[in-house]
From Swiss-Prot:
Cofactor or coenzyme needed: FAD
UniProt keyword annotation of Flavoprotein present: yes
Record keywords: FAD, Flavoprotein, Oxidoreductase, Sporulation
Nucleotide-binding is among the record's keywords: no
Native organism taxonomy: Bacteria, Bacillati, Bacillota, Bacilli, Bacillales
Catalytic activity: a 2,3-saturated acyl-CoA + A = a 2,3-dehydroacyl-CoA + AH2
Species, as recorded: Bacillus subtilis (strain 168)
GO cellular component: cytoplasm
Domain of life: Bacteria
UniProt cross-references to InterPro entries, sorted A to Z: Acyl-CoA_DH_CS (IPR006089), Acyl-CoA_Oxase/DH_mid-dom (IPR006091), Acyl-CoA_Oxase/DH_mid-dom_sf (IPR046373), AcylCo_DH-like_C (IPR036250), AcylCo_DH/oxidase_C (IPR009075), AcylCoA_DH/ox_N (IPR013786), AcylCoA_DH/ox_N_sf (IPR037069), AcylCoA_DH/oxidase_NM_dom_sf (IPR009100)
EC number: 1.3.99.-
Name assigned to this protein: Acyl-CoA dehydrogenase
Swiss-Prot/TrEMBL GO biological process terms: fatty acid beta-oxidation using acyl-CoA dehydrogenase; sporulation resulting in formation of a cellular spore
Entry-linked Pfam families: Acyl-CoA_dh_1 (PF00441), Acyl-CoA_dh_M (PF02770), Acyl-CoA_dh_N (PF02771)
Induction, as annotated: Subject to catabolite repression.
Length: 379
């Protein structure tokens, strides 16, 4: 894929910002597991929170490839910050940009694009993970408002976000065709944030429960029409999956970089361990998988950029890159030996952060199912 001068400049700017601002913040996040509010504000001031948002709504007006470049570079330094940005943009802002009316766009997107507000995506429920069409949260219209009742779990940016793209049943007897999408503001009466989950990795990125107890959402906050919700969710998951693939690619490349440096410096039996085929072959395989993942990620991003169907390619990129990230992190820990198991060394964190990329935004089993349906004519 040809990279434009603008994309090269974007990559350099993000890389410099990540090393200067994100790296030290990531160390604090790892120790405290606290959300990096001040860092997000800085990212907003640098134009990173609205990269693909048109300038008329306060964004940078860049393309999807530039946005994916940013997630990729940030995730090399901090996968936690990478997922905060990915969820905010791909599924917290884009649903309004793609499916909102002009009034909704003008009301919400400028604050999201500037980083003054943070976005989240509330789809997953205790009883519906991979089966996104089996929601139980309901939205009953009454006196010009929708009353939402139910709960969501595993919501990235939960408790930190100002805007939640929320999915609920307006016609429970119609299954997925009865799902609608709503813009829910954080101070909505009847809406509360539940417990914050304690996770294996991605420290500092909030993952929470959301509770709706007759939450009063104005009729004006319905996205699209009643019954459009499932389509809205699935349409935005494509770019969301490319974003997670870029996050995984960043992890894989970071693991490779650390492993190469360590293998060249660590001396055993009178020579660097990189001189041993058992190590050098691991590094070669890590590099090959990372390069293959990079091509899949940017091919999918380029297709999306050109308005072409990228469902299969997004799933391929997400599945392959996340598998590559986990394998790279595992191999990096092995190359580090006992040091790799210790929190004082970076590869331990990479391994913990990598695992979830195989799970969220659709498990890799779901990705393989999607790919096979494209191949067999099921979509």
């Amino acid at each position: 894929m040809h990279v434009t001068q603008e994309q090269v400049m974007m990559r350099k700017m993000v890389r410099d910002f990540a090393r200067k601002e994100i790296a030290p913040a990531a160390e604090i996040m790892e120790k405290t597991d606290e959300f990096p509010f001040q860092l997000i504000k800085k990212m907003g001031k640098h134009g990173l929170m609205g990269i693909p948002v048109p300038e008329q709504y306060g964004g940078a007006g860049a393309d999807v490839v530039s946005y994916i470049l940013a997630i990729h570079e940030i995730s090399r330094i901090s996968a936690a910050v990478g997922v905060i940005l990915s969820v905010h943009t791909s599924v917290g802002t884009n649903p309004i940009l793609y499916f909102g009316n002009e009034e909704q766009k003008m009301k919400y997107i400028p604050n999201l694009a500037s980083g003054d507000h943070l976005g989240a995506f509330a789809l997953t429920e205790p009883h519906s993970g991979s089966d996104a069409g089996s929601l139980r949260t309901t939205a009953i219209k009454k006196n010009g408002k929708y009353l939402l009742n139910g709960s969501k779990i595993f919501i990235t940016n939960g408790g930190a976000a100002d805007i939640y793209i929320t999915f609920a049943l307006t016609a429970p007897d119609q299954g997925r065709h009865g799902i609608s999408a709503f813009i829910v503001e954080k101070n909505t009466p009847g809406f509360t944030v539940g417990k914050k989950e304690r996770k294996l990795g991605l420290y500092g990125s909030n993952t929470t429960e959301l509770i709706f107890d007759n939450a009063e959402v104005p009729e004006a906050n319905l996205l699209g029409k009643e019954g459009d919700g499932f389509h809205i969710a699935m349409a935005n998951l494509n770019v969301g999956r490319i974003g997670i693939a870029a996050q995984a690619l960043g992890i894989a490349e970071a693991a490779l970089e650390h492993a190469v440096d360590y293998a060249k410096q660590r001396v055993q039996f009178g020579r660097p361990i990189a001189a041993n085929q058992g190590i050098s072959f691991k590094l070669a395989d890590m590099a090959t998988r990372a390069e293959a993942a990079r091509h899949l990620v940017y091919h999918a991003a380029d297709l999306h950029n050109r308005g072409l169907n990228c469902g299969k390619e997004a799933s391929m990129a997400k599945q392959f890159a996340s598998d590559a990230a986990v394998k790279a992190a595992l191999d990096a820990v092995q190359i580090y030996g006992g040091y790799g198991y210790m929190k004082d060394y970076p590869v331990e964190r990479l391994l913990r952060d990598a695992k979830v990329t195989q799970i969220y935004e659709g498990t890799n089993e779901i990705q393989r199912l999607i790919i096979s349906k494209y191949l067999l004519g099921g979509t």
